[in-house]
């Protein structure tokens, strides 16, 4: 029987306290808060440092260790089908809510008075986005370049190819597979070490946000923010909740299970900061490694539900605020463009804003300068985006695993009922399966 550790040693508690201290520091000592920005940036860079090798190890060991290669294509197909359906629902919900509530109505903003220079960089980055360019960008110029740049989709593509090739070698490739599995244990131990710095990273990021923009900016354009936050909550509880119930588990229990990851995301405003831990948590929840390794990384580009809600709401809000008329044809066009452009968003802070700029440029009917209206509050809405994205990808992993019959449902229910062991609460060797040996297909 294990003794429960003191509350103050829990990462969950430490991150909550750090966020609270960050808010107070940013409010009462704004210059100090702004100066703490490197703490948040440094933490996210540490996480990004190990994301590429972790994805590589997880995907390769999962695919190479599978008996039936057809199941890989089946898993990928089901995952993309799920992503497309649910993200489309998210886009539609955002569109309906912003039309009903009309948060920008009555602002009567003159576009010519807006400072477009503030959003010029986002517009330039947005114009670089194209469907063909996005597809070609998935193919890395070099293997080293994919890992050096930390491009998740490029690393994922190479990992899938490498996993297939290693599987074809059979027993001859076993030493390589064993090495990759042991290397993965080292990477996850590094993650455990980095996560001890999560409270410091969350404190720095939150102190900077409040110090730079002020609590007052939380009130400015508050109707849009409140509308967006409520929509995200309803999406998680109603839409994702219904999906979870239909597949035999509770979304509230799942949220409780990933509470530490949600707090890390809340502090850093980046769902990417929780990616390595999500790989561990979802596998521990009963999903096979091969499913987790494909669904989670792919979902960070194709299943961003919170970002989808934000994109439709922000685009129509700009139209309402600038008195730009949007009839049903314009809104359908916007929706169709977003069905494509939203798939290019990554799970990092600010990517949603770049995709919004790309969308406004592509649609043409909406004033791109209107981006300046929401630039100040975009940082505060990124928390809701990132949290919704994370929950959406957790649900997707369980659902797809169940669809392809790669889910241990007894383990799922047991883990959800217990609330899940905190990764930082147990021995690292036990968490990462070191005691189990190098077998890549073992589900912990």
Curated annotation (Swiss-Prot):
Which GO molecular function entries does the Swiss-Prot or TrEMBL record give?
fumarate transmembrane transporter activity; malate:proton symporter activity; succinate transmembrane transporter activity
InterPro entries the record matches: C4_dicarb_transport (IPR023954), Na-dicarboxylate_symporter (IPR001991), Na-dicarboxylate_symporter_CS (IPR018107), Na:dicarbo_symporter_sf (IPR036458)
**Keywords, comma-separated and alphabetical:** Cell inner membrane, Cell membrane, Membrane, Symport, Transmembrane, Transmembrane helix, Transport
- Gene3D superfamilies this protein is in? Sodium:dicarboxylate symporter
> Which residues does the annotated region (Disordered) include?
418-444
Primary location class: membrane
* Topology versus the membrane: Multi-pass membrane protein
Q: Name one GO cellular component term.
A: plasma membrane
Q: Where are the transmembrane segments?
A: 7-29, 44-66, 79-101, 143-165, 186-208, 221-243, 291-313, 353-375
Q: Does the keyword Transport apply?
A: yes
Compartments it resides in? Cell inner membrane
Pfam families in UniProt: SDF
| Gene Ontology terms: biological process | L-aspartate transmembrane transport
The Swiss-Prot or TrEMBL record describes its family as follows: Belongs to the dicarboxylate/amino acid:cation symporter (DAACS) (TC 2.A.23) family.
Q: What does this protein do?
A: Responsible for the transport of dicarboxylates such as succinate, fumarate, and malate from the periplasm across the inner membrane.
* Name used for this protein in its record: C4-dicarboxylate transport protein
Which gene is transcribed and translated to give this protein?
dctA
């Amino acid at each position: 029987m294990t003794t429960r550790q003191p509350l103050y040693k829990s990462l969950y508690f430490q991150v909550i306290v750090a966020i609270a201290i960050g808010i107070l520091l940013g409010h009462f000592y704004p210059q100090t808060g702004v100066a703490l920005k490197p703490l948040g940036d440094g933490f996210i860079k540490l996480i990004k440092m190990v994301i590429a090798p972790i994805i590589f190890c997880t995907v390769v060991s999962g695919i190479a260790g599978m008996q039936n290669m057809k199941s890989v294509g089946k898993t990928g197909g089901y995952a993309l089908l799920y992503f497309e359906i649910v993200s489309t629902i998210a886009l539609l919900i955002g569109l309906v809510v912003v039309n009903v509530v009309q948060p920008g109505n009555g602002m009567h903003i003159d576009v010519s008075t807006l400072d477009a220079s503030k959003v010029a960089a986002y517009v330039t980055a947005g114009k670089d986005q194209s469907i063909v360019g996005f597809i070609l960008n998935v193919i890395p110029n070099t293997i080293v370049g994919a890992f050096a740049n930390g491009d998740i989709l490029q690393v994922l593509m190479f990992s899938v190819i490498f996993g297939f090739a290693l599987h074809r070698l059979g027993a001859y490739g076993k030493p390589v597979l064993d090495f990759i599995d042991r290397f993965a244990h080292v990477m996850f131990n590094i993650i455990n070490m980095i996560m001890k710095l999560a409270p410091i990273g969350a404190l720095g990021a939150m102190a900077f946000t409040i110090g730079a923009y002020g609590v007052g900016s939380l009130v400015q354009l508050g109707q849009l923010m409140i509308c967006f936050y409520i929509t995200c909550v309803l999406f998680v509880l109603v839409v994702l909740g219904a999906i979870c119930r239909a597949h035999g588990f509770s979304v509230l229990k799942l949220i409780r299970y990933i509470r530490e990851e949600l707090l890390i995301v809340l502090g850093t405003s980046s769902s990417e900061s929780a990616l390595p831990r999500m790989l561990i948590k979802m596998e521990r929840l009963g999903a096979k490694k091969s499913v987790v390794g494909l669904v989670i990384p792919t979902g960070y580009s194709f299943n961003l539900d919170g970002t989808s809600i934000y994109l439709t709401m922000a685009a129509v809000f700009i139209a309402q605020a600038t008195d730009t008329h949007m009839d049903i044809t314009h809104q359908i066009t916007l929706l169709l463009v977003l069905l494509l452009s939203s798939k290019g968003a990554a799970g990092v802070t600010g990517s949603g804003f770049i995709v919004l700029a790309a969308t406004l440029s592509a649609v043409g009917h909406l004033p791109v300068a209107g981006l300046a209206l929401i630039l100040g509050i975009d940082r505060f809405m990124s928390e809701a985006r990132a949290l919704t994205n994370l929950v959406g990808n957790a649900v997707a992993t369980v659902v797809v695993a169940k669809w392809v019959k790669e889910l241990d449902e007894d383990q799922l229910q047991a883990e959800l009922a217990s609330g899940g062991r905190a990764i930082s609460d147990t021995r690292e060797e036990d968490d990462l399966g070191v005691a189990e040996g190098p077998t890549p297909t073992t589900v912990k």
